């Protein structure tokens, strides 16, 4: 059945493929879940099918061709130096290492010496208070940064009580990582009296429409958070 779906995906045009995926998303999800797709480089029929689906999903992402190419190039080079550290940190804090690595790529493109004008630094671009809260003494140390970022994401996941699906919860965790848990909580409280019923789409709309002292004429802080969430999810999936 899964092989038939893959063959069909290759035989139809791109716009038709989008419709095809939407109609058969549940079937694809069930098959992939049952087969427990892995991103480890072990070549099996299942891994080939999973790789094909991943490529299709990436093709329909909102990333530009340049961004996709950059991600692939650095995945084959820079990521390899730190891959085991991502795997070990993710296992320690019960995360998927690909998810952790996707956050790091969006933050720093896996550059341990990355800095921003807002004084966040390192592989996971931690703020000074966040770094202190997870025991990171040197934000430019890639190992400390990876483990600190993993711990922080794990803590956020435990704190987030929003979203009506696992995908929604992941989006809320990412939003909190970028915007801060307090700001996300305040936004959720303004949307609905029952936080557990708030969806990511509702928060996304609220963030885009809300105003902040950090906004510029062309780019709002809320839009920045939405872009962060969507890009990480594109890199991750």
Predicted regions and their residues:
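Second-shell loop/turn segments in exported
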Residues: 69-76, 86-89, 112-114, 132-143, ...
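Substrate-binding/active-site groove segments that recognize
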Residues: 113-137, 144-155, 205-207, 232
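Bacterial N-terminal signal peptides that target proteins for export
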Residues: 13-25
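Secretory-pathway/luminal and periplasmic proteins that interact with or process carbohydrate-rich
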Residues: 108-117, 156-162, 179-193
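Catalytic and substrate-binding regions of cell-wall glycan-acting enzymes that process beta-1,4-linked
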Residues: 55-60, 171-236
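N-terminal export signals and maturation junctions of secreted/periplasmic proteins
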Residues: 10, 29, 34-87, 112-113
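Short, functionally critical alpha-helical segments immediately adjacent to catalytic or ligand/cofactor-binding
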Residues: 87, 95-111, 146-150, 173-179, ...
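Alpha-helical transmembrane segments
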Residues: 2-8
């Amino acid at each position: 059945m899964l092989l038939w779906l893959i063959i069909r995906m290759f035989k139809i045009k791109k716009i038709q493929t989008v419709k095809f995926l939407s109609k058969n998303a549940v079937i694809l999800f069930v098959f992939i879940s049952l087969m427990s797709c892995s991103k480890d480089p072990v070549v099996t029929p299942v891994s080939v099918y999973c790789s094909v689906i991943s490529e299709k999903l990436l093709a329909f992402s909102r990333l530009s061709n340049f961004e996709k190419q950059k991600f692939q190039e650095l995945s084959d080079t820079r990521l390899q130096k730190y891959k085991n550290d991502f795997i070990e940190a993710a296992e320690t804090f019960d995360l998927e290492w690909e998810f952790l690595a996707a956050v790091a790529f969006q933050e720093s493109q896996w550059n341990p010496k990355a800095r921003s004008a807002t004084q966040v630094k390192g592989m996971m671009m931690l703020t000074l208070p966040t770094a202190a809260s997870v025991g990171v003494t040197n934000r430019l140390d890639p190992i400390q940064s990876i483990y600190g970022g993993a711990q922080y994401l794990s803590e956020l996941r435990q704190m987030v009580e929003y979203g009506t699906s696992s995908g929604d919860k992941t989006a809320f965790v990412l939003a909190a990582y970028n915007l801060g848990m307090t700001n996300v909580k305040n936004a959720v409280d303004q949307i609905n009296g029952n936080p557990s019923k708030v969806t990511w789409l509702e928060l996304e709309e609220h963030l885009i429409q809300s105003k902040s002292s950090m906004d510029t004429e062309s780019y709002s802080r809320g839009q920045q958070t939405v872009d962060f969430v969507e890009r990480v999810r594109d890199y991750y999936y």
